[in-house]
Amino acid sequence: MASTASTRKSATTRKRNPRGEGERLHASLIEATGELLLERGDADGLSIRAVTGRAGVSPTALYLQFAGMDELLQAVSDEAFEDLGDYMCAALEAQGEDPRARLQAISEAYVRFAEQRPGHYRILFATPGRDGRKELLGEEDKGVGKEVFDLLLASTADCLPQGSDPMPVALQLWTTLHGYVSLREVMPGFPWPDVTDFVRQLHTAHFGVD
């Protein structure tokens, strides 16, 4: 007779899926979570039952791919960072070679992404289990948000005199953009400037009149 410990271990071990089925389940759960975030605007109250119901699978199916809701939200957050990077890259590629125009484009793209996908934007920085800056920006190119920040850092460097350290300015731009997004959400009645005007004024304050 198997021991109680062995039985318990067997019951909690994730089952293997047929080849290809696991990937489809993984993708469908992330997609379902993304749809619910778009509809709800945040992850508050988002449940395993709601996600699996949207994905058309049983609640227990989630545990075949993820340890729980926190791990699923981390996966959705990672994918959202990739989407934000793609969104900013597309804005950059649509510009010419003018450094200020390129920085304007990716700064606006950052804000537009947050406006269009508020639920995804919120979990970028508030996902359960995240270890702050170490995991977001990472070390040795491992951070999930490093591509996004590197775009801003490189574009900032192009607007500064050669040899200048772009890090302090890039951090100030990032925190200001994040603050603009966050405050507009909680203070919608305040007379906020248009995104384009705000970004232009922000850059003028740092780099002077273009």
Language model features: what each stretch is:
Residues 28, 39-71, 75:
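Helix-turn-helix
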Residues 89, 133-161, 167-171, 197-208:
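Amphipathic alpha-helical packing segments from all-alpha helical-bundle domains
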Residues 89-119, 146, 163, 170-173:
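Hydrophobic alpha-helical connector segments
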Residues 1-24:
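N-terminal intrinsically disordered/low-complexity leader segments
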Residues 24, 28-35, 54, 71-94, ...:
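Alpha-helical structural segments
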Residues 112-154, 182, 189:
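Short secondary-structure transition hinges
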Residues 28, 50, 105, 109, ...:
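Amphipathic alpha-helical interaction segments
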Residues 174-192, 206-210:
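Amphipathic C-terminal alpha-helical segment
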